[in-house]
Curated annotation (Swiss-Prot):
Name of the featured protein: Photosystem I reaction center subunit VIII
Domain of life of the organism encoding this protein: Eukaryota
Gene: psaI
Spans through the membrane: 9-29
Family: Belongs to the PsaI family.
Length: 36
């Protein structure tokens, strides 16, 4: 099956890359603090 390798790609993507991306966006959001 072609979809048998999908969890081995999707789990690191959601578990590692998405938190790092969200933390980077949050860091840039805090640095460019133009709300206050």
């Amino acid at each position: 099956m072609a979809a048998s390798f999908l969890p081995s790609i999707l789990v690191p993507l959601v578990g590692l890359i998405f938190p790092a991306f969200s933390m980077a966006l949050f860091f840039l959001y805090v640095q460019t603090d133009d709300i206050a």
